[in-house]
């Protein structure tokens, strides 16, 4: 049961990034997104991923791999967009 809760929580928190990723990819605009927040979030997700590996916790690992992918897309657009903040 606790694994099911972990998978559902991981799914919901990870999928919550999908609308933002889709908007950024479609509009190519990140002006209203905080660069520093996403950099700190990226680093936090990397640490969660490492923690999941160290604990062999599949829900944590899977959620953070997908979240890293989404956050990397947003950060890529943010960092390559120019001087917009």
Curated annotation (Swiss-Prot):
TM annotation in the entry: 5-25, 33-53, 57-77
Residue intervals of the PQ-loop domain: 2-59
Domain of life assignment: Bacteria
Topology relative to the membrane: Multi-pass membrane protein
Alphabetized InterPro entries for the sequence: PQ-loop_rpt (IPR006603), SemiSWEET (IPR047662)
Any Gene Ontology CC annotation: plasma membrane
Gene Ontology MF annotations: D-glucose transmembrane transporter activity; protein homodimerization activity
Protein localization: Cell membrane
Task performed by this protein: The homodimer mediates transmembrane sugar transport down a concentration gradient. Transport is probably effected by rocking-type movements, where a cargo-binding cavity opens first on one and then on the other side of the membrane.
Protein's UniProt name: Sugar transporter SemiSWEET
Species of the source: Leptospira biflexa serovar Patoc (strain Patoc 1 / ATCC 23582 / Paris)
Source organism phylogeny: Bacteria, Pseudomonadati, Spirochaetota, Spirochaetia, Leptospirales
């Amino acid at each position: 049961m606790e694994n099911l809760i972990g998978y559902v929580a991981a799914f919901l928190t990870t999928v919550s990034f999908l609308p933002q990723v889709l908007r950024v990819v479609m509009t190519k605009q990140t002006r209203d997104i905080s660069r520093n927040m996403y950099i700190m979030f990226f680093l936090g997700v990397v640490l969660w991923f490492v923690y999941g590996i160290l604990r062999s916790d599949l829900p944590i690992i899977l959620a953070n791999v997908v979240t890293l992918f989404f956050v990397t897309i947003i950060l890529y657009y943010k960092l390559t967009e120019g001087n917009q903040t």
